A protein has these predicted regions:
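Active-site-proximal loop/turn and secondary-structure-junction residues that shape catalytic pockets
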Residues: 1-3, 53-57, 101-105, 133-137, ...
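Short N-terminal secondary-structure initiator segments
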Residues: 1-10, 73-74, 125-137
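Active-site gating loops and adjacent loop-to-helix segments of metal-dependent hydrolytic enzymes
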Residues: 2-25, 191-202
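Active-site acidic/histidine proton-transfer and metal-coordination neighborhood
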Residues: 19-128
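Extended interaction regions within the primary functional domain
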Residues: 5-16, 25, 65, 87-95, ...
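Short, flexible/disordered intra-domain loops and linkers
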Residues: 4-10, 59-69, 107-108, 141-150, ...
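Histidine-acidic metal/acid-base catalytic patches
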Residues: 31-47, 124-131, 137-254
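Residue-level signal for well-ordered alpha-helical segments
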Residues: 14, 18, 26, 95, ...
Length: 254
């Protein structure tokens, strides 16, 4: 899976940045890198390991529409993961793999179609979904407030089938009400080298993906509907301290 199009080769990635920013230049390099990362992590016996089942071409990072197709991304992701896991003992990963949604092409979870495609193409059993509430809000229109986001997510989650709900074993819990920014930011072409362009995109992505703590009591209904085993309060903290956002959100759950 490419992080940029062939037309962008003039802004090629330096060799020492490739493993960290795009896993590899070729299919075999990507498979090797992901395999090594999983085996390194297995030494810690984690309950699960999270991977974003998505891809964005570098030229699309500062755009509202994307050149990649979600179904193609999911199929390519499954092919890669099947190759990675197929070489492991018993054809299963050493710990459960949790595939996370993003607003970029790939696993989005605004309905069941992405999940069904993932389910039908993966050839191993020990996997689950890690649903990121803020990432899903970043995909939806008209999310100006926390309440907008909570209401929109619950409308989606109440439409999930039971087997999808049971596959969601972890949640990254936070909100993002960034539609005002998403609908007005100035689009930008890739106008510098790849590493510099990625660096310049971090503030932009942070404006989209806000990782704010819930204060709306109805957010608890999200957990009641999805019944995850693990809830990660994925929050950065604020000027008062690194745990302030966590405490604010955690008190809502009881």
């Amino acid at each position: 899976m490419e992080i940029y199009k062939k037309s962008e080769k003039k802004n090629d990635m330096p060799d020492d940045s490739v493993p960290y920013l795009m896993f590899g230049r070729t299919r075999d390099e990507v498979v090797q890198r992901v395999s090594e990362d999983i085996m390194i992590a297995s030494a810690f016996s984690p309950t699960h390991g999270v991977m974003h089942a998505s891809n964005v071409s570098l030229c699309d990072v500062w755009r509202r529409t994307y050149s990649d197709d979600s179904r193609h991304v999911i199929r390519s992701f499954c092919e890669m993961m099947n190759t990675v896991v197929g070489s492991m003992p018993g054809g299963e990963p050493p710990f459960r793999l949790a595939f996370e949604n993003l607003w970029w092409p790939g696993l989005r979870l605004s309905d069941e179609s992405d999940y069904r495609l993932l389910e039908s193409n993966l050839e191993f059993e020990d996997w689950c979904i890690c649903l990121d509430t803020g990432h899903l809000m970043n995909l939806l229109p008209d999310i100006y407030t926390e309440k907008d986001g909570v209401d929109a997510l619950l409308d989606i989650f109440y439409g999930y089938s039971r087997d999808l709900v049971e596959r969601i074993r972890a949640i990254h819990f936070h909100y993002s009400a960034s539609y005002g920014y998403r609908s007005t930011f100035e689009e930008r072409s890739m106008d510098c080298d790849a590493v510099s362009f990625i660096g310049s995109a971090y503030p932009h992505v942070s404006m989209i993906d806000q990782h704010l703590p819930f204060s709306e009591p109805r957010c608890v209904e999200i957990l009641d509907v999805l019944e995850p085993d693990i809830v990660v309060h994925e929050l950065p903290g604020n000027e008062k301290g690194p745990l302030e956002d966590f405490v604010k959100q955690r008190t809502l759950i009881g």
